[in-house]
Amino acid sequence: MKPATHPPALLAAILACHIGLASAQITTPSPGTYVRKGGGGDLVVQAGGKFHIQTVGANGHTCELEGTITNGRARMANSACAVDFTPAGQRVGVDTATADACRDFCGMRAWFGGDYLRPTPGCTDKAIAASRRNFKRAYDAKDYRLALTTLAPVLQDCDEVLTGVTKGWLRNDLALAQLRSGDAAACRQTLAPLAEEAGKTDQELREVYPPTDADVVLPMLKAARTNLRLCS
């Protein structure tokens, strides 16, 4: 019996279909929640390519987009805005060649482009909140060694998905635990990245930051000022 043969046109169609499916699998991010590098936003991808992006920019301005990703691209309804998605391992690059049209989905000081990362299990919002609660419990019980081993990995391992303000509060908490455990030098070292801004007056800081951002940043820097004095 002769083996079955297919006309060249049919073979080409079958090959094109397989290539198309492979391309879709490669260029559509896996379902899950991805955090924008540096914090301040997330990308949620559902089965079938449905997605939702929400980010927060300067002065509380935001972006919000949703749609369906097809072959690495999503076109916004009733708009010329098209968003491109480039998965690479546990990251997804988000970009657009239609920035002007996509501005309709953002406040003046916000944007959504950039790298989005799938957080490790210890760096999800829920896991970080649990670590901070456990830290406080250990700190209040004066078990400073346990407090340090509970919170230090968050600052070290979750750096890429934390906002600057969140990192600042983590540093303040860790510095106090280090001080209470008798290591003032470690306290100063932990707070060193905050020292320059903490050394400025409130007025100087308000001249640097937009109003809403200043309201968020100032309490953290005031705590750093106090803790730097305690560690000195």
Name each model-derived stretch:
Residues 184-202:
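TPR/TPR-like (Sel1-like) alpha-helical repeat modules
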